[in-house]
C-alpha cells in the first residue's frame, strides 16, 4: 500500500496502470468549492497553478476529464471516496474502501490518529493526529457566490 496525495498524481494514471496493472487508485473527491478554497487558503507556494482562480478552475477541469476517462476505460481501477460521505459515516465508507482494495476491515481503521508511526509533511499534518471531524463541511458556502463567475462554465461546479 502506497499513499501519496500530491495534487498532480492524476497525470500518472496511465503510467501507474501500465506498470502496476492490478493497482487500485483511491480518488478522494471533495466538494469542489471546499477544495478550491482550501488551495487558496493554504498558500501552496510551489504549485504554480494554485495562485490564480482561473488557473485553479482550469486545472480542476483537466483533473475531472482525466479521472472520468480512466474510470470509463478501467472500471475497477479507481474508487471514488466522497470526502463528505466519509466524514458523515466513516465506518461504512471505510468498509467499502477496504473491500475495493481487497483488504480486511477492523476498528483500528478508524483509530489512525492513535498511531505514533505516521509521518506527514503536508497541510494535513494536524488532521492525522485527531479523529475524523465534520466541521469543514459547508464552511465555505459563503464564498460560493464569489467563485460562481469562474465556475459557471464547468458542469462539475454547482
Regions found by a protein language model. Give the residues of each.
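PAPS-dependent sulfotransferases, especially Golgi type II membrane carbohydrate sulfotransferases
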Residues: 1, 36-80, 87-158
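Short, flexible loop/turn elements at secondary-structure junctions
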Residues: 7-8, 32, 85-87
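Short, well-structured alpha-helical interface segments that form or flank functional binding sites
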Residues: 11, 31, 92
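Glycine-rich phosphate-binding loop used to anchor ATP phosphates in small-molecule kinases
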Residues: 1-17
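Conserved phosphate-donor/acceptor-positioning beta-strand/loop module used by diverse small-molecule
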Residues: 16-41
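Generic beta-strand/beta-sheet core signal
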Residues: 4-6, 26-29, 81
Amino acid at each position: 500500500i502506497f499513499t501519496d496525495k500530491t495534487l498532480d498524481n492524476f497525470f500518472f494514471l496511465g503510467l501507474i496502470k501500465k506498470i502496476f496493472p492490478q493497482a487500485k487508485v483511491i480518488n478522494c473527491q471533495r466538494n469542489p468549492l471546499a477544495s478550491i478554497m482550501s488551495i487558496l487558503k493554504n498558500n501552496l507556494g510551489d504549485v504554480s497553478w494554485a495562485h490564480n482562480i482561473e488557473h485553479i478552475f482550469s486545472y480542476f477541469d483537466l483533473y475531472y476529464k482525466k479521472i472520468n476517462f480512466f474510470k470509463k476505460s478501467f472500471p475497477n481501477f479507481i474508487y471514488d471516496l466522497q470526502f463528505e460521505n466519509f466524514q458523515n459515516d466513516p465506518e461504512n465508507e471505510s468498509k467499502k474502501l477496504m473491500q475495493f482494495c481487497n483488504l480486511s476491515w477492523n476498528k483500528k481503521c478508524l483509530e489512525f490518529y492513535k498511531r505514533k508511526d505516521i509521518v506527514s509533511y503536508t497541510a494535513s499534518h494536524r488532521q492525522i493526529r485527531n479523529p475524523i471531524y465534520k466541521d469543514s463541511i459547508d464552511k465555505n458556502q459563503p464564498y460560493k457566490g464569489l467563485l460562481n463567475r469562474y465556475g459557471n462554465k464547468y458542469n462539475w461546479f454547482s
